A protein has these predicted regions:
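Short cytosolic juxtamembrane segments of multi-pass membrane proteins
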Residues: 122-128, 619-633
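Membrane transport/envelope proteins' first extracytoplasmic loop
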Residues: 1-31, 99, 155-167, 180, ...
Length: 633
């Protein structure tokens, strides 16, 4: 038995590992972009110094070695302290993954600046126009292969370890979106700049024109190299795609978990009586009047009824008697056997022996023959019924293979013994479990009081008065069942890891935008100072910086939302969420607007606020400082 539990835990952990790895992979991708951007910023700032060293006889290898030494002074102690802090705060018996991750980050941080400097100091070569298209085509090919593999095998194939290609599929889609956006954004911004140029104002035209061609004309750009303007777009797209895809997965998990729980409970709340014993008088009505109850469905269930006249002669069924409109709403909300309540109407008209309309389960309908049937209840009494509709399941008995018959409460009440006293109550809404239990305790018959007459055949079940209140009339709510399912450590850890990854990716994306702004601070401050001498007001300077920086942010937010939606549409149908839900559910992630738009709008607002603060700070620089003699910017 213990070995089976260990094997079950191993299989669940193996199934959840790829889903939990998507978030950290997104953080790693954004962090990689940020480190590359930091290396580009450092190399641009020290470009003149490095070229001077090369002109004075220094070799490229010597300069790169010097930069490695400079970086080691700060990177190695910081990496060691960070790794030690991680081990102390989050102790684990297996240190190898943590140490390997720390070593990879350290190596990347140490090499980003020297590698960028080595590229800048390389002898100029003829521009190869095919280099960028070939690289983009390679990324597109790898992305297509990853998406096809995910659609074919799923993100977490049974019995296999984490496949990096499958886990990286959302990130590759974001990378493709970033490359496409880097092609389209300058063109669209250029159109907007030309449209703004036809107006009377100059602020919008200048800002959009600088955004279209890329701000800054010094450093690497002045020598014909393209600046790292695509990196902030990629960072924002990675963060938004990771956040949107992760939020869609988590919402689908919550939705699927609620759906499973609702089917298990029978709604958002349920009260049942033991056996065929009825609920206390007035309990169903009082429960329906509690705050938070949207729909009240009292019903009567009998598992010992029989249908006479089927292909097998006599078939034992579960008989459900409920008010048609309320039961139809319950079925529609639960997604279990939805039907039109008009199908069960008309059973009360006509002679007393007229057949009552009934809903047959699919299994029973396959045994049915044309005509009417005799329905004999286990509590006593019988009636004639006709098939008014077929349902594949019903909330009163949602399990597969159930043979059920649903009757309307009105016509059946006078023909079946005890059906006027419901023995089940289902509710929709958000009722409080403690209020329901208090209501059950208040309406339960006293120990010395006469018990209500039970239906015939209920004697083999324990009476309600002989049981504790929690066992006599058990109360179940979907909120408690969802909390119980979500309390699983594996699911809770995966969910927390996902949200932590989304927050970290957003932080790194914001850092990427700030690094981009810092890269152009000297040139932008000099431009503002010169424009101030020509009558530019401080408020107009802030507007100019916003007009220059916000098109990138808005384009990244819109593109990230579209890429996140594409990732959910392409990869979602292949994701099995059963491990995260805690129960077997159909494969697939639902695409909804909320989880995709909220990360995009939130990150765009955060970046816009950071740009506004930087713009207001840059506008306070002194003109005399920026226009000093000998300024080389």
């Amino acid at each position: 038995r213990l070995s089976e539990l260990f094997e079950q835990a191993r299989v669940r952990r193996q199934a959840a590992a790829p889903l939990a790895a998507i978030g950290p992979a997104g953080v790693g991708g954004v962090a990689f972009v940020v480190l590359c951007l930091a290396g580009a910023l450092a190399s641009d700032r020290r470009d003149a110094e490095l070229r001077l060293l090369l002109a004075r006889g220094g070799s490229r290898a010597g300069i790169v070695g010097r930069l490695l030494g400079e970086g080691a002074v700060t990177v190695l102690p910081a990496a060691a302290a960070a790794a030690a802090l991680a081990v102390l705060l989050l102790p684990t018996p297996r240190l190898a993954p943590a140490l390997l991750s720390a070593a990879a980050v350290t190596l990347l941080a140490l090499l980003a600046f020297p590698v960028r400097a080595a590229v800048l100091l390389a002898p100029p070569r003829p521009a190869a126009r095919w280099r960028r298209p070939v690289g983009e085509l390679l990324v597109l090919t790898v992305t297509g292969a990853a998406v096809l593999e995910v659609r074919r095998r799923g993100i977490s194939p049974a019995g296999s370890d984490v496949d990096p290609l499958l886990v990286a599929a959302p990130l590759l889609l974001a990378l493709c979106g970033g490359l496409l956006l880097a092609r389209l954004q300058p063109v669209v911004t250029g159109w907007l700049a030309r449209a703004a140029g036809r107006g009377s104002g100059l602020i919008g035209f200048l800002g959009l024109a600088r955004a279209a061609r890329g701000s800054g004309s010094s450093g690497a750009r002045a020598r014909g190299r393209s600046g790292p303007s695509v990196l902030p777009l990629v960072a924002l797209l990675l963060a938004i795609t990771t956040g949107g895809f992760g939020a869609a997965v988590l919402q689908s998990v919550d939705s699927a978990r609620l759906g499973v729980v609702r089917l298990t409970v029978g709604g958002d709340a349920a009260i049942s009586a033991p056996g065929n014993s009825p609920l206390p008088d007035g309990l169903a009505k009082a429960a329906g009047e509690l705050p938070g109850v949207r729909t009240s469905v009292p019903l009567w269930i009998d598992h010992d009824s029989f249908v006479l006249g089927t292909a097998q002669g006599t078939t034992q069924v579960t008989l459900v008697v409920a008010e048609p409109a309320a039961y139809a709403e319950l079925s529609r909300t639960l997604g279990c056997g939805a039907f039109d309540p008009a199908l069960l109407a008309g059973g009360g008209a006509g002679p007393a022996d007229a057949p009552v309309p009934a809903l047959f389960s699919a299994d029973l309908a396959r045994q049915a023959t044309p005509g009417t049937y005799v329905l004999r209840a286990g509590s006593g009494g019988e009636l004639r019924a006709r098939v008014a509709g077929v349902v594949d399941c019903t909330p009163a008995q949602p399990g597969p293979g159930g043979v059920t018959v649903v009757l309307p409460a009105g016509p059946a009440t006078a023909l079946i013994h005890g059906v006027d006293r419901p023995n089940r109550w289902f509710g929709l809404g958000s009722p409080a479990a403690d209020r329901l239990r208090a209501l059950v305790s208040a309406t339960r018959p006293a120990a010395g009081a006469a018990a209500p007459a039970a239906a015939p055949g209920a004697g083999r079940y324990p009476t309600a008065q002989a049981l504790p209140v929690d066992e006599a009339y058990p109360v179940r709510t979907s909120a408690e069942a969802v909390a119980e399912l979500a309390a699983d450590p594996l699911q809770r850890s995966a969910q927390r890891l996902f949200w932590a990854s989304v927050a970290a990716a957003a932080g790194f994306a914001l850092l990427a935008v700030l690094l981009t702004l810092m890269r152009n601070v000297p040139e932008r401050a000099a431009l503002l100072a010169r424009l101030r001498t020509m009558g530019l007001r401080r408020r107009q300077g802030v507007a100019l910086i916003l007009a220059e920086a916000l098109p990138h942010t808005l384009a990244a937010a819109l593109g990230g939302a579209l890429v996140a939606a594409a990732a959910v549409a392409l990869l979602g149908p292949a994701m099995d969420l059963s491990t995260l839900v805690g129960a077997s559910v159909p494969t697939g992630v639902r695409l909804t607007a909320g989880p995709v738009l909220i990360p995009a709008v939130g990150l765009a607002a955060l970046v816009a606020a950071a740009v506004l603060v930087e713009a207001a700070t840059s506008g306070r620089r002194q003109i005399t400082t920026e226009l000093r003699a000998g300024d080389q910017r």
